């Protein structure tokens, strides 16, 4: 590695201890095509001296063939790994890179800028705490800038750094920078992004990325790296109530029965009264078990196994919550924003598999309430959602599930839709709220029969649809 830590050479155990105790920041870079996203990541790694010497040699060699800049080294090649990306000078897939500084660990997701790769960007943004939105100083706020900002807001990212890139091409003009800042802030009034920072940079030359530049003396703010190291993300989760989606029931012998999962929010202690949802059965936490031994407390992000004082029926897909805290919704129906990811359009009425925090259940899209144009943010009616389109949909499940709004808790408010024939992921969703369900008294006898039939199929033949059942009955008769 070009950068050698004295601590690594002197005391490897102390280095590992410090590294383990650093907090983690996940962020994405997004913006219009050729705004310099991959170059910026390469510059962050290069100027932080976090590139291996063999990597640097390989980039120098590849730059002679694929260089898209006037520099000796094209730093974008550190991230653009696919051959098609290098040949076209664009990003297609989401590329992840990992690095750390003295203050924090980072995971970067370099997302594609093209509209046809909206699903790729949604994937990268779904786990991020912060977004860097690049704007070309020569072009200003573009349609793709608005689209990416909308997706960032939709996916609950609360921190945005707007990096006005290529300032060297406009002679570091303060007027250009101020105009872009004001235009973006006017647009962002319609979005739910509470924390926005601006920084003028040149990713190609490294100005204001890791080190300050004297070329823009009018800018007295922090560098991009300083903002990344100091942004506060510990209070981002609005939900403080305990949520443990059960991923696995561990029963190695007759004397042990534990419920495994990663805590989505809140904290739990031995002795806490808990409720299993959707059944509503109550018990108390007997022990918090981990590989390193029992714990006196476990919090969000920790993978644990809980044992309970009572033998109650809990299965994979159920959710454990504390009895004295706010509970999630338990319902068969909710509204959610869906991002279409499959080649075939999403259509109301078709049976899909739904995966919510480890729970798999079948159901359907009851209605598409509206489709949102990600470029203009205008809503319009729609009968289907094609690849990369986003819409607000009403979902109806065949059995009840526990969930929160995505804004309150990502872990219990997100879902994916699965094609039941190919098992491919056809959409990702963010739950908005529980929708109004029809009461049983308001349903017709035929609708009640369909509900009970769906429940029986889900219980005994989970891969079979009503149409398949009807076809089999016709064949046998």
From Swiss-Prot:
Tell me which residues bind GTP: 31-38, 110-114, 165-168
- The segments labelled G1 in the record are 31-38
Could you give a GO molecular-function term held by this entry? GTP binding
Gene3D superfamilies found in the cross-reference section:
P-loop containing nucleotide triphosphate hydrolases, Translation factors
Query: Which keywords describe this protein according to UniProt?
Result: ATP-binding, GTP-binding, Nucleotide-binding, Nucleotidyltransferase, Transferase
Annotated region (G5) at 202-204
Q: Which domain of life is it from?
A: Bacteria
Query: What segment(s) does the record annotate as region G2?
Result: 89-93
Question: A biological process (GO) annotation for this entry?
Answer: sulfate assimilation
Query: What is the main EC category here?
Result: transferase
Q: Which pathway, metabolic or otherwise, does it act in?
A: Sulfur metabolism; hydrogen sulfide biosynthesis; sulfite from sulfate: step 1/3
The EC code for this enzyme is 2.7.7.4
Q: Which InterPro entries match?
A: CysN_GTP-bd, CysN_II, CysN_NoDQ_III, G_TR_CS, GTP-eEF1A_C, P-loop_NTPase, SO4_adenylTrfase_lsu, T_Tr_GTP-bd_dom
Q: Where is this region: G3?
A: 110-113
- Which ranges carry the tr-type G domain? 22-239
This enzyme catalyses:
sulfate + ATP + H(+) = adenosine 5'-phosphosulfate + diphosphate
**Which Pfam family, any one, appears in the UniProt record?**
GTP_EFTU
* Residue segments, region G4: 165-168
The subunit field of the Swiss-Prot or TrEMBL record says:
Heterodimer composed of CysD, the smaller subunit, and CysN.
Report the function annotation for this chain: With CysD forms the ATP sulfurylase (ATPS) that catalyzes the adenylation of sulfate producing adenosine 5'-phosphosulfate (APS) and diphosphate, the first enzymatic step in sulfur assimilation pathway. APS synthesis involves the formation of a high-energy phosphoric-sulfuric acid anhydride bond driven by GTP hydrolysis by CysN coupled to ATP hydrolysis by CysD.
In terms of NCBIfam families, this protein maps to: CysN, PRK05124.1, PRK05506.1
Regarding protein family, the annotation reads:
Belongs to the TRAFAC class translation factor GTPase superfamily. Classic translation factor GTPase family. CysN/NodQ subfamily.
| Name of the molecule in the record | Sulfate adenylyltransferase subunit 1
**Which organism is this protein's natural source?**
Chromobacterium violaceum (strain ATCC 12472 / DSM 30191 / JCM 1249 / CCUG 213 / NBRC 12614 / NCIMB 9131 / NCTC 9757 / MK)
